[in-house]
Every structure is written in structure tokens, then in C-alpha cells.
């Protein structure tokens, strides 16, 4: 089961040198203060300022109108790295705290997964800001391999993209 609560997390200033904890199990909490079942898997340097965002099972919107939608497409089990720090919901949370546009969100996902690893299955996230929409598909590189295999494609103006639990990006340059 996924958590059913929603909470608006306030913008915050953080001390220089602070660290931000990364967890597994966040989608299965019963309320915003429930820490049963959470597993701390690591820490990353905290940003000095984080934006307010809507915290749901898959965090989805911040105060800068950066929005993220998620759909799972699984991917091969052989590409899942259980030691990768980030699951998709934690990547979404960090992106919404730190980014104000879709392109920066994609860059941050690339940086975080290269540095700390991606431990989830195949996911497609739609990342939108007031000016453009991108589809990013991501999966692990394999057991014991830090990083992620990902591709992103901009949705052209005037077009619609639908991702219903299947990969949508067909061609890469």
C-alpha cells in the first residue's frame, strides 16, 4: 500500500555544511511523522535553501510550478542495483526542493544518480515547468553498478504525451 496523506512542506534555509538524509520506505508511512519502516540509506550535502513542495507518495509540485508525475514500467530485474541510494520518490523530493525548472531537474537527477546510484526499477517521470515538459525514463545500470541508464525527451509544444506504465521514448539521437 502507498501512503495516502498529503502535506505541504515549507521552504527552508539550512546551515552551510548540513547534510540531508536519504531514506527507503517513505511511500509506506501512515502520516507525516511516521518513521516506522523507514531505512536511512545515506546522506547528501544539503542545499542552503530548499523550496516548498507538495509531499505525497510521489512528491509532485513545488512553489516554482515545477511538477513531476510518475509511472512505473519496471524494466529488467538484472538492472536493479539494491545498493543504489536513490529510489524514484526520493529523487523527486530532492528535485522539487532544489530546482525551479525541468532542465535543471534532469541535470540534478543525472548528477545524483552518478554520484550515489539509483536503486529502483524502471520509471518514467514527466517533469513540467511553466515553459516546457520533459519525459525522463530511468532504470539502474545493474547489480553493484553505481549510476543509472536514463533518457529524456522534450514534449513538443502543442503535443501531448501519455505514459501508462510503459516506456514512451522510442528514438534517441
Name each region found by the language model.
Residues 78-81, 90-99:
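Second-shell loop/turn segments in exported
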Residues 96, 102, 120:
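Cysteine-dependent hydrolase recognition
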Residues 1-87, 108-173:
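A contiguous strand-loop segment
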Amino acid at each position: 500500500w502507498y501512503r495516502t496523506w498529503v502535506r505541504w512542506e515549507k521552504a527552508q534555509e539550512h546551515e552551510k555544511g548540513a547534510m540531508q538524509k536519504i531514506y527507503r520506505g517513505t511511500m509506506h508511512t501512515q502520516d507525516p511523522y511516521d518513521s516506522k519502516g523507514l531505512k536511512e540509506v545515506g546522506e547528501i550535502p544539503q542545499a542552503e535553501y530548499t523550496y516548498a513542495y507538495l509531499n505525497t507518495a510521489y512528491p509532485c509540485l513545488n512553489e516554482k510550478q515545477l511538477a513531476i508525475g510518475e509511472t512505473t514500467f519496471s524494466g529488467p530485474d538484472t538492472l536493479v542495483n539494491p545498493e543504489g541510494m536513490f529510489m524514484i520518490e526520493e529523487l523527486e523530493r530532492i528535485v522539487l526542493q532544489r530546482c525551479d525548472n525541468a532542465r535543471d531537474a534532469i541535470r540534478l537527477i543525472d548528477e545524483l544518480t552518478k554520484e550515489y546510484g539509483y536503486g529502483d526499477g524502471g520509471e518514467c517521470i514527466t517533469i513540467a515547468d511553466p515553459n516546457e515538459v520533459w519525459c525522463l525514463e530511468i532504470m539502474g545500470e545493474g547489480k553493484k553498478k553505481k549510476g543509472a541508464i536514463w533518457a529524456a525527451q522534450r514534449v513538443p509544444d502543442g503535443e501531448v504525451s501519455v505514459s501508462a506504465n510503459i516506456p514512451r521514448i522510442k528514438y534517441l539521437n
